[in-house]
């Protein structure tokens, strides 16, 4: 199965995920082993140009994270802390990154319109799920398939070139309007349990990676 984030019905944050001024979602606040708080989202939302194995055009550790988003009127709330580097032409673990908030006490751990995640569960076919996203708000869907392998193509503004990478162990959610551009990084929830992180989609389904 192949899903390309191109202009129109498909989405992967914005049609060209590496523009260093994105809009997407901070999935939710996670507590690290040392007790500090980080904001979890997609690498293509938070981290911009560093997600490939190419020579990077921007050193994004410390890159400002803006709220409500780089395409909106904004204020800086966090900086990029760490990310999973994507494997050009290979297999990538996930499209994910963490940001360090300036004022952890200001972070609301709840998800707008949903509950506070209290556990993590695996996706299973037939599971009813919800997500709260920047573009489409709170939507309900059903996990259609698990253990899905999908090839994603990311385009890079700085060079007007692209690279592809495979993601294994993904799951899909239907219907197609479960997510849309700007919803990348949303946490897929089942009740009060986090199921995965939304990172891409087409006009027929959305793709997530398990937590």
Label for each model-derived stretch:
Residues 2-169, 189-191, 195, 199, ...:
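Serine endopeptidase catalytic core focused on the charge-relay Asp
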Residues 173-193:
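Hydrophobic alpha-helical bundle architecture
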Residues 202-203:
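A short acidic/small-residue loop/turn micro-motif
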């Amino acid at each position: 199965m192949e899903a390309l984030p191109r202009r129109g019905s498909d989405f992967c944050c914005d049609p060209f995920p590496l523009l260093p001024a994105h809009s997407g979602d901070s999935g939710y606040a996670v507590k690290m082993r040392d007790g500090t708080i980080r904001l979890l989202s997609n690498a293509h939302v938070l981290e911009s140009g560093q997600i490939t194995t190419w020579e990077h055009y921007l050193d994004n550790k410390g890159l400002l994270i803006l709220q409500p988003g780089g395409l909106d009127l904004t204020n800086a709330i966090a900086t990029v802390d760490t990310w999973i580097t994507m494997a050009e032409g290979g297999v990538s673990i996930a499209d994910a990154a963490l940001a360090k908030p300036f004022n952890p006490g200001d972070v609301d751990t709840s998800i707008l319109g949903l509950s506070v995640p209290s556990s993590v569960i695996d996706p299973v076919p037939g599971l009813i799920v919800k997500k709260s996203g920047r573009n489409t708000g709170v939507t309900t869907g059903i996990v259609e398939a698990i253990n899905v392998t999908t090839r994603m193509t990311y385009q890079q503004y700085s060079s007007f070139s692209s690279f592809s990478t495979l993601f294994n162990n993904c799951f899909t959610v239907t219907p197609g309007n479960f997510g849309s551009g700007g919803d990348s990084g949303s946490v897929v929830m089942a009740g009060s349990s986090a199921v995965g992180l939304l990172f891409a989609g087409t006009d027929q389904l959305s793709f997530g990676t398990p937590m």
